[in-house]
Amino acid sequence: MSEQADKCNSRWKDEAMQNGYIPSYLDKDELCVVCGDKATGYHYRCITCEGCKGFFRRTIQKNLNPTYACKYEGKCVIDKVTRNQCQECRFKKCIAVGMATDLVLDDSKRLAKRKLIEENRERRRREELQKTVWDRPEPTQEEWEMIRVVTEAHMATNAQGNHWKQKRKFLSAVGVKEAKPEDIGSAPIVNAPEGNKVDIEAFSQFTKIITPAITRVVDFAKKLPMFCELPCEDQIILLKGCCMEIMSLRAAVRYDPESDTLTLNGEMAVTRGQLKNGGLGVVSDAIFDLGVSLSSFNLDDSEVALLQAVILLSSDRPGLTSVERIERCQEEFLLAFEHYINYRKHKVAHFWPKLLMKVTDLRMIGACHASRFLHMKVECPTELFPPLFLEVFED
């Protein structure tokens, strides 16, 4: 490199530029050493702008420099205004400031390099993700005890346990019948009533299981020390608020894709249409959709139990007096729940936030059912409503 080029190189590198984004590895306000435009990074061993980088690359790749000819004896001043007026002087300046021709790759090498960069980037992303997953905190000893208590409470109050598929019976037009292998996927459907009317026969079948289902939710709550320590008035409000949500969750996790049914209270398998016609209307769609969604989560008993505890201890139920206390209880369960999810190491992306969204879905189901309940009271004979059902869902 000539002495004059060395001086130019030093002068260009010392110049500053106002504003403009540059990579973090460059000094602030760096200029292109060729034309003085905004520099975007190190390109072919020099700090240059995108324009000069592209010009230099094209010149080398297509061997264009022999075709360049200066009209002014090779003495053109190259800046961001004049850089496109003389290709020969611009290329000479690129060489003078130190841009390396041997670093310009042909198409095949450039594609291979790009592929390698993408592969390395993806590998680092996977390693970072794996490191993040494995480094997340798992339950403490106290949290394990909390998880044990809530899991046992759920299993002790969850009808038929893990044997619900063997124990279930299908709702039919003539009542409830035993489930047989050939019944799967072909359970008879009660004829849909006209308009928005409730199918009284289906509703009467549902009322037979509603009281034990509600009782099991109450029993679940009573087995949690945090809940039992709350004032009785708050316990009642929490139970009335969460009952439909927990029953819906328990039905949703017993969704069977083969027969496209939910199993209520661990014993009655119903189709979407039967649940809708039996009084729940559009609420049935929300419960079935939740069941379909949860089937990909592969929740275990502890996760279902913790989800129920989080729903039970919702501090925003109207009329509560111990709001802060209930909020703290829910936060303890949420933290233990998150740590347990870390321990389980699910392969579903963003598993924890996606699962928390199901709480929102269940709250919506509860709100929709409250509205639907008023319609059911109009459509169905009062004597068909079990006393506990009315006690829980009437305001």
From Swiss-Prot:
It is found in: Nucleus. Keywords: DNA-binding, Metal-binding, Nucleus, Receptor, Transcription, Transcription regulation, Zinc, Zinc-finger. CDD domains: NR_DBD_TR, NR_LBD_TR. 3,3',5-triiodo-L-thyronine 1 binds at residue 369. One of its GO terms (biological process) is retinal cone cell development. Residues 29-106 bind DNA. Zn(2+) 1 binds at residues 32, 35, 49, 52. 3,3',5-triiodo-L-thyronine binds at residues 216, 265. One of its GO terms (molecular function) is RNA polymerase II cis-regulatory region sequence-specific DNA binding. Residues 1-31 are annotated as: Modulating. Composed of three domains: a modulating N-terminal domain, a DNA-binding domain and a C-terminal ligand-binding domain. PANTHER family: NUCLEAR HORMONE RECEPTOR, THYROID HORMONE RECEPTOR BETA. Belongs to the nuclear hormone receptor family. NR1 subfamily. Nuclear hormone receptor that can act as a repressor or activator of transcription. High affinity receptor for the thyroid gland hormone triiodothyronine (T3). Transactivating activity is ligand-dependent, and is repressed in the absence of T3. This is Thyroid hormone receptor beta. It comes from Danio rerio.
